[in-house]
Every structure is written in C-alpha cells, then in structure tokens.
Amino acid sequence: MLLLLPILNLSLQLHPVAALFTVTAPKEVYTVDVGSSVSLECDFDRRECTELEGIRASLQKVENDTSLQSERATLLEEQLPLGKALFHIPSVQVRDSGQYRCLVICGAAWDYKYLTVKVKASYMRIDTRILEVPGTGEVQLTCQARGYPLAEVSWQNVSVPANTSHIRTPEGLYQVTSVLRLKPQPSRNFSCMFWNAHMKELTSAIIDPLSRMEPKVPRTWPLHVFIPACTIALIFLAIVIIQRKRI
C-alpha cells in the first residue's frame, strides 16, 4: 500500500479521474477549536464497489504541492462497509490546519476529494493590567490574550498609538500584547478589542484606570543611594549590639 500511494499521487496529477467510481464530500471545510476532536468524511456509493476487500482509503495532507500520509488521522474502518471513509483526529492542534486529500480506492478505480481544516482558538480570556507611571500623571494599560489565528488589536476612541506585539507559544498559539500609555480622565473607560479576521470573531475587555489602579511601577533604587543607606543601617546595628554586650 505504501508503494501504491506515490504512484497514485502521480496519477492524480496527470490523469483525469475515472467516472466509474465517484467520491463525494458532505462537508468540505471544517472549522475546529483547538483541543477538540474532528472527523473528516468523504462518501462513496457501495453499489459501485461490490467487493469489500477491495476498498482502501487514506487521508493525505497537502503541503507545498506535495502530499504525505497524515499521521494524526485514524481511519474508522468499520464505516467503510457503509460507504463512508471517516478519519478521526483527536485533540486538534494548530499544526493540523491545512488542506487534505481524501483518497478512496475500489479495486482498480479510485477518486478523491479535497477537505480543508481551519483551526481556531478564540481570544476569549483577555488579561488586563493597569500600572501608574511615577512622576508623569500617566497610566499604562495592558491587554493580553492568546488565540489563533493572529488577531488585530485596537483601542476604542483613543488617539494615542498603542504598542502591540505578539509571540508564538509552544502550542503554536499567538500571545498578543497591546500596551497603551496615557493620562486617565474621570468617568472614562477604555476598551481593547481583539479582531480575528479569519474567523470573523470580535472579543473585547473594558478597563477603568481610576477604579482598578494597581501599585505603582516599582522604582529602581540607584546604587549611590542604596549602598550608603545599607552601610548606615549596618553601623547602627553593630553599635546597638556592642552596647548590649557591655551592659
């Protein structure tokens, strides 16, 4: 079977599919949440393939004009007699997204259908933080969330530009961080919005700088202040200890 697949791959590119055997796809695009499971399905008419022993099915992931057998998908062979080639992918990951070719072989005849998997992770949990910037009268607002695909961040009704960046997590998700620095105003809230354009999904968080003020941004003590202060404290402690011993 492993030797047969490369030959079939070449045949799929060079020759039209025989009309004697037809594969259909009840669903061509699958949108799946990270961590959930999915079953990719392509169907065929059992009346066109009378010998059960002659039915073979495989799922190949298409990347860079090449196709490789999917190691993440498991064929549910008990569904073949029902005219279904069902491939189960558990605990979907970001790397499972892409295009697949569902190939069904019936004796000397074969056909295939392309299926697409779109993986998403909603930016539902938005962590917010407020820090007071000493000596400026300004606050630093931060919104951070993880998701997939990459989202755009905007701040509603704010003219000050925000500093937005992202990194990839080991799971392949995007960790997006947006930082805004400005002077707070009484009775004014700020809203950061994460727009996932690929999935047409919008999530947001509201920040009230005055009601949820966190501790100030810690100042770094200069060495020329820190060292003398420690020295004086040690001298004072030594004097106290010596006087107690004399008593």
UniProtKB/Swiss-Prot annotation:
Keywords: Adaptive immunity, Cell membrane, Disulfide bond, Glycoprotein, Immunity, Immunoglobulin domain, Membrane, Receptor, Repeat, Signal, Transmembrane, Transmembrane helix. Residues 243-247 are cytoplasmic. CDD domains: IgC1_PD-L2 (cd20986), IgV_PD-L2 (cd20983). Changing residue 84 to S: No effect on PDCD1 binding. Residues 1-19 form the signal peptide. The lineage of its organism: Eukaryota, Metazoa, Chordata, Craniata, Vertebrata. This is Programmed cell death 1 ligand 2. Disulfide bonds join 42-102, 143-192.
